[in-house]
From Swiss-Prot:
Gene3D superfamilies: 3.40.1350.10. This is UPF0102 protein Abu_0255. It holds the Pfam family UPF0102. PANTHER family: UPF0102 PROTEIN YRAN (PTHR34039:SF1). One of its GO terms (molecular function) is nucleic acid binding. InterPro entries: Restrct_endonuc-II-like, tRNA_endonuc-like_dom_sf, UPF0102_YraN-like. Belongs to the UPF0102 family.
């Protein structure tokens, strides 16, 4: 996916989250060599660390969520929590963007 397509998907995801009563805390948090968290949001005192995936079809987008990617996200989340000295409840989520369809998958696991 091109950077431009990725940026468009992230903007759609942010709009979706805001309409769903999420507060956007941070975008594109880079955790040194660990990786990037696309969106950090909060709703009902729970932090949501969100990976945005976009593709021409749903199956391709879902298949791009690998155990390696989830492991990097988890390490990035741990780094963010430690760096900011937070004691929080959180969820690792994915937003799938295919054209104008957006789906939030909450609390994904490996």
């Amino acid at each position: 996916m091109s950077k431009e397509k990725g940026d468009i998907a992230e903007k759609k995801a942010i709009s979706f989250l805001e309409k769903s009563n999420f507060e956007i805390v941070e975008k594109n948090f880079y955790a040194k060599k660990l990786g990037e968290i696309d969106i950090i949001a909060q709703r009902n005192k729970i932090y949501h660390f969100i990976e945005v995936k976009s593709a021409n079809d749903y199956e391709t987008a879902i298949n791009n969520i690998t155990s390696q990617k989830l492991s990097k996200i988890k390490r990035s989340v741990d780094f963010y929590i430690q760096k900011n000295n937070l004691n929080i409840s959180y969820s690792i989520d994915v937003i799938i963007v295919v054209d104008d369809k957006i789906e939030l998958l909450e609390n994904i696991t490996m």
